[in-house]
C-alpha cells in the first residue's frame, strides 16, 4: 500500500482489500514512526475497522482512518491536551465532530501530540516530548497542532483534525508541507474541545490535498445546539472544488510582508499570486493598517480567556492530583506540578490583564483593537474575493532554537493570529520550498465564504506540484 494516499485512494484500497487491512497498514507505519506524532494510538482501531467491514458501512468516510488532536474528546481515549495535569483523563463523551466522523464511518487511529493546552507554535511544550518535522527531524513541525500535521506529512494518517486559536492548524500545515484550514468562527462545533480561548478557536482539518479538506469539512461542519457559537451556514464544500479562477479578485495585504520575512518565503508567495494571475485571476495591493497591533491584542485576549478556562483544572474532580495537607495546598501543588512553564506563564499574564487595576488598560483595549482588525478585514474583503499572503514569515526552525525566548516564539504568529481576531476562514496550501523546507501560501476569505478560498487553493494546487512532494526523512 502506498504510504501517502488521498481519501479517494484509501476508499479504493478498502474496496480492493478491507478497512481492517488498510487500518493495519497505517498502524504498522505508525509503529515505525520517527516523528513522535501520536500521544495515544487507539487499541480499538482495528476492531472499529473490522466492524465497518462486517456491517458494510456506506458513509462518506467508511473505513477511512483519521488522526485526532489530543484536545478533542473521544470516548475511551485519553484527552491529555499534551499536559501532565490531564495525562490520565479519559472523557465520558464524544466531541460533536467525533460523532459526525463516526457516523460517516471514519476509523480513529489515535490522538496526536500538541503544545500543552494548545499554547505554542512548535509542539515543544508538550508533556510527552516534542514532535519532529518529517522534512527535517531536527526541526519543529509548527504548533500547536504539530502532531496532526506531522502524521499527515509522514504518511501516518490520510488526514487529521486540529484546532486553530491563533494559527495552530495553518502554522504546522505550512511547516510540514500539507494543507490546513481554519474555518469561519462558528462553522464547526467546539463542543467537546478543551477550551484555550473560546472566542478565537475553531476545529479545522489537515490533509495532503485541498480535495480532502473539502471532504472532511462536508462531514464535520454544521449547526450544533450544544455550542452556542455554532452557526448553520449550509455551505457545500466539495462543490467549491472548481479548477477556475477566472475573474477572481485577489487582495495582497502589504502588512503581511513585513520586516523579518524570509526572502525565499516572500518570493514563493509572490510566485503563487502570479501563477493565479496567469490562470485568469487579478490582484491588487490592499492595506490593513491595524494589523500591526493584532499580535499584542491576540495574546492579551487569548491569555485572559486561558486564565479563566484553565481555572477548572485543580485536581478535585479529574486529572492529576498532588497530595497536600488541605484542599488549598492540594490545589496549589497540583497546578504547580501539573502545568508546564508556558501554560503557567500565560495563566499569570492573563490573570494580570484581567485584574482590577489593568482590565481597562489591557483587556478592554485589546478588544477595541480586535474590532479595528475585523473592520480592516471587512474593508479589504469588500473590494476583493480573497486575500493572499505568507502563512508563516519563515520556514520551520530547529527544535530548541526559540523555546527559551517566548517573545520570539510569539512573533511566529504574526501572520496567522489576525485571522482569528476577525473570525474569517483561512487556508494554508504548499507553494514552494527553501533549503528543502516547505513554504505555505495563506488564502483568506469572507466569513462563511470557504468556497472562494477552496476554489483558489484547489486551482493553484491543480496547476502546481508542491502538494505531491514527500519528506525524504520518512519516505
UniProtKB/Swiss-Prot annotation:
One of its GO terms (cellular component) is glutamyl-tRNA(Gln) amidotransferase complex. The keyword Nucleotide-binding applies. The gene is gatA. It catalyses: L-glutamyl-tRNA(Gln) + L-glutamine + ATP + H2O = L-glutaminyl-tRNA(Gln) + L-glutamate + ADP + phosphate + H(+). This is Glutamyl-tRNA(Gln) amidotransferase subunit A. It comes from Methanosarcina barkeri (strain Fusaro / DSM 804). It is an enzyme of class 6 (ligase). Heterotrimer of A, B and C subunits. The active site is at 69 (charge relay system), 144 (charge relay system), 168 (acyl-ester intermediate). Keywords: ATP-binding, Ligase, Nucleotide-binding, Protein biosynthesis. Allows the formation of correctly charged Gln-tRNA(Gln) through the transamidation of misacylated Glu-tRNA(Gln) in organisms which lack glutaminyl-tRNA synthetase. The reaction takes place in the presence of glutamine and ATP through an activated gamma-phospho-Glu-tRNA(Gln). One of its GO terms (biological process) is translation.
